[in-house]
């Protein structure tokens, strides 16, 4: 089993990532964006007997002055069917051949559920339990999607559809969505939340030639005033919910229910097969968790982080 840390082709990586409906963190543009912000990114291709088995993208950070931690989040991308034992062999090979000075630590959080991962991977130790996320299958019909919604969520959607809200698309040029980033910053400061730097979103959107195909930003207006907005990042056949904001009026009118429903229609037209609403934290963000889980998507618990 050989690991190649250079000589990668961005187009071929993107094609594999799209075909496999890969997560945002394994997207080539994700790594390019992190490097633009001064964060180290490592990419690997694993082969056996000349046949490619996996692609893996790591984000590496120094921890104090002691060690470097490299995280392969929601990866690797498996290029062909492998058993749990074979996958473990790939992870061990990546860990052993990581091109960083010691002391170093390689972490993997595969984009797999506990049921599909096998959990017991020889040579790997789970150090963190898996997070849960909500996935909406956009290949389902409108009738199927609405039937899967929590009845209260669906009732709020129906109410929003009759509330006179005007939903429109926001352009992907920075000046067109700068106000949304300002609102997101206010939310983070008020609630004590952290996340990717807001500048990261701008860099990611513009890491590709066609910025309009990389992001979907929808805004709902009530009585001529901004009431709510949601921003989704598109990577291949998957979209990930990234930013959401609502005014008091927007919350009263259930604007986010309507925006999400219209985003589903728009993303489906763009060829997106799956919408990832992101992590569910019922303790710190109970309201947001209820919104995501009520949308009718499938709650998936990933297998965790391994070293």
Kindly label every feature range from the protein language model:
Residues 2-10, 33, 60, 119-144, ...:
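Active-site/acyl-donor-binding loops of N-acyltransferases
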Residues 3-49, 55-65, 112-114, 121-129, ...:
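A conserved beta-strand-loop-helix scaffold within acyl/acetyltransferase catalytic domains
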Residues 69, 103-105, 238, 274:
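Residues at the N-termini of beta-strands
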Residues 73-83, 139-140, 244-253, 281:
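A short, internal acetyl-CoA/4′-phosphopantetheine-binding micro-motif in the GNAT/acyltransferase core
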Residues 80, 112-116, 281-285:
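Acidic-and-aromatic substrate-binding clefts and catalytic sites of carbohydrate-active enzymes
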Residues 86-130:
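Non-catalytic accessory segments adjacent to catalytic cores
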Residues 91-96, 203-307:
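Aromatic (often tryptophan-rich) hydrophobic motifs at membrane interfaces
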Residues 106-107, 168, 274-278:
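Short catalytic-loop micro-motif centered on adjacent basic/acidic residues
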